[in-house]
UniProtKB/Swiss-Prot annotation:
Produces ATP from ADP in the presence of a proton gradient across the membrane. The gene is atpC. Pfam families: ATP-synt_DE_N. It comes from Helicobacter acinonychis (strain Sheeba). This is ATP synthase epsilon chain. It is a peripheral membrane protein. HAMAP family: ATP_synth_epsil_bac. It is found in: Cell inner membrane. F-type ATPases have 2 components, CF(1) - the catalytic core - and CF(0) - the membrane proton channel. CF(1) has five subunits: alpha(3), beta(3), gamma(1), delta(1), epsilon(1). CF(0) has three main subunits: a, b and c. PANTHER family: ATP SYNTHASE DELTA/EPSILON CHAIN, ATP SYNTHASE EPSILON CHAIN, CHLOROPLASTIC.
């Protein structure tokens, strides 16, 4: 299976870059998945969690909102704010706390935020 290149960038710099099997993005019309060979598109992202599947594990990045440019070979994400939640990390609890604050500040829609927060707590 061919790998998709992905980068997540915020105003402060790069949060994540790598080659992945798939990525699930929190689009404003709902979550959508991207695999290698996807049709080209540019879309708006809402506050939520980006789910990244590498060859060996799943990784998660919480974002406040942003834009995604998708081509057949890569996904470039420009986000207003992002927190990379590493699965096996000493500062994982701190990252989850920062992700919760980021999402709570990003949206006034309490129902949407609570469902995303529940998703983060289950990681």
């Amino acid at each position: 299976m061919a790998l998709l290149k992905i980068s997540v960038v915020v105003p402060e710099g790069e949060v994540y870059t790598g080659e992945v099997r798939s990525v699930v993005l929190p689009g404003v019309e709902g979550e959508f998945g991207v695999l290698y060979g996807h049709s080209n598109m540019i879309t708006l992202l809402q506050a939520g969690v980006i789910e990244i599947e590498t060859e060996s594990q799943k990784e998660h990045i919480a974002i406040s909102w942003g834009y995604a440019e998708v081509t057949g070979e890569h996904v470039d994400i420009l986000a207003d704010g992002a927190v990379f939640i590493k699965k096996e990390s000493d500062d994982r609890d701190d990252a989850i706390s920062r992700a919760k604050r980021l999402l709570e500040d990003a949206s006034s829609d309490r129902l949407a935020v609570s469902s995303v927060l529940a998703k983060i707590e289950s990681l």
